[in-house]
Regions:
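Short alpha-helix plus adjacent loop in nuclease-associated cores
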Residues: 124-146
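A short alpha/beta connector and helix-capping loop motif
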Residues: 56-73
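Short His-Asn-centered micro-motif
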Residues: 48-50, 78-81, 102-105
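Short acidic, Gly/Ser-rich segments with clustered Asp/Glu that frequently serve as metal-coordination loops
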Residues: 45-58
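Short active-site oxyanion
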Residues: 95-100
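Acidic, Mg2+-coordinating catalytic module of metal-dependent nucleases/exonucleases
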Residues: 145-190
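N-terminal accessory regions of nucleic-acid-interacting proteins
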Residues: 1-46, 115, 126, 179, ...
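Short active-site loop/helix that positions an aromatic residue
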Residues: 55-56, 108-115
Length: 190
C-alpha cells in the first residue's frame, strides 16, 4: 500500500475524528488489575500508551499516571497513580510473545522504568515503523491522518490524569490513543 510522506496541519484538521468504539475499563483496584492482566496475557497484539499529568513548571516532570493497554474490543486504563506496576503488568510489558504497538514508546518505557525497572520486549514504535512506508511525519495525529484518513483528537492531552475520577472525555481520549495504534499497524502491515 502507498502512503503520502506528509500531511499538513490544515489537512489533518479537516479530517473526521476517529474514536474507540469498544469497551473501556478503568482499572483502579488490585482485583480489576488482575482480571485485566489475565485477559491481556492472552492477546498477541496490544495498543500501548501512557499519560502523565502535565507540569507547567520548568524542570518539573510528573510520574506516569495512566497506562493504556488496548485490544480491538477493550481498552484497559490502568491508573498507575493508584496502583503499582505489578509483576503481572511487567510480564506483559516484558513479553516477546505479545506485540505492544504505540507511538514514541521509548519515552513511555523510560517513564514506566522510573516507577519500577523492567526489561521491555515486543514493542513496536509507529514513529520508526512508518518510515518503512515512506511516511515522514512522526506525530500520532499525522500518522493517523495519513494511514487511516482520520484524525486523533488531542483535546484532553493536557488534562489532569491524576484526578480522583477520569472524565468520559479523558477515558475516550486515552482509549483512542492506544487503540488507534493497532488500527494503524494493521493497515500498514496488511
Amino acid at each position: 500500500m502507498k502512503f503520502v510522506a506528509s500531511i499538513s496541519n490544515d489537512d489533518v484538521a479537516a479530517l473526521e475524528a476517529v474514536h474507540f468504539d469498544g469497551r473501556i475499563e478503568v482499572v483502579e483496584t488490585p482485583d480489576a488489575l488482575a482480571k485485566a492482566c489475565k485477559a491481556l496475557s492472552k492477546e498477541r497484539l496490544i495498543g500501548f500508551d501512557t499519560e502523565t499529568r502535565p507540569s507547567f513548571k520548568a524542570g518539573v516532570t510528573n510520574k506516569i499516571a495512566l497506562l493504556q493497554l488496548s485490544t480491538k474490543e477493550c481498552c484497559y486504563l490502568i491508573r498507575l497513580n493508584k496502583l503499582p506496576l505489578t509483576r503481572e503488568i511487567l510480564s506483559i510489558l516484558s513479553s516477546n510473545e505479545i506485540k505492544k504497538v504505540g507511538a514514541d514508546v521509548r519515552n513511555d518505557i523510560n517513564g514506566l522504568n522510573k516507577l519500577r525497572h523492567f526489561t521491555a520486549n515486543g514493542f513496536i514504535d509507529l514513529q520508526s515503523e512508518v518510515g518503512k512506508y515512506g511516511i515522514e511525519d512522526k506525530s500520532l495525529r499525522k500518522i493517523s491522518g495519513i494511514v487511516l484518513g482520520k484524525k486523533v483528537s488531542k483535546a484532553q492531552r493536557l488534562s489532569n490524569w491524576e484526578a480522583k475520577q477520569l472524565t468520559p472525555q479523558q477515558q475516550m481520549y486515552a482509549a483512542t490513543d492506544a487503540w488507534v495504534c493497532i488500527e494503524i499497524y494493521n493497515k500498514l502491515t496488511k
